[in-house]
């Protein structure tokens, strides 16, 4: 969205319930900031407390309503981008949750009470977007039943990247012993790092292996391949295997 522009979108709540005991529920909406941390976990915080928060740009209605089973309920969200908005992604989330006073306990019967929070996340993109992905390091280790590979990814740009990644482990003869086909990894936010382990459910015999991690950041650059050595010793205590230094190359 351009600085100074405005648009309205609709978030639909579909209360899909077929149980005989389904009842209308009172819900309340609010805004949170959000991010994805270095470990790949989505984190939420109070509105307008995180860098690049878009929470002040949103107005929504209704803030509170009653939803009934079998119906779709709309929340209208108006986004107004300030004229002085900086380039890049600005993030916010519309949170919908059940009102606490809607949770009624019956002291004469056993009950399981579930409270929920749902989030519709927003990426508001202000032009002059940059996506600059890099593979900073690569670590690999073997446990009794798994190979765990941990790449450290970095986005030096100001807009989210959705990398495509694949993984292959070969033995000393160059024969593939385990691999993962290409798939989309977690989003890598602008200015962020991500170190999320990739797990292969396989048991490796003692020996020396080569781990190849290939990544296409889809940022206009060529795919990158990180290579590291994995040494699986004879195990006596079930500890992890050694891992060698990383080598990365652009193809």
Regions found by a protein language model. Give the residues of each.
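Surface-exposed binding patches on compact interaction domains or structured appendages
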Residues: 17-77, 164-167, 171-177
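Short proline/glycine- and polar residue-rich coil/turn motifs
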Residues: 2-3, 65-73, 185-194, 220-222, ...
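Short edge beta-strand/loop segments characteristic of extracellular beta-sandwich folds
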Residues: 10-14, 78, 148-156, 199
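Short, solvent-exposed loop/turn segments enriched in Ser/Thr/Gly
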Residues: 4-10, 73-75, 86-93, 145-149
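A short tyrosine-centered beta-strand micro-motif
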Residues: 90, 94, 207-215
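Short, acidic/polar linear motifs in exposed loop/turn regions
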Residues: 16-21, 35, 83, 100, ...
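Short, surface-exposed loop/turn segments at beta-strand-coil junctions that are enriched for proline
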Residues: 66, 80-86, 201-205, 218
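Beta-sheet-dominated interaction scaffolds and their linkers
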Residues: 1-23, 64, 133-146
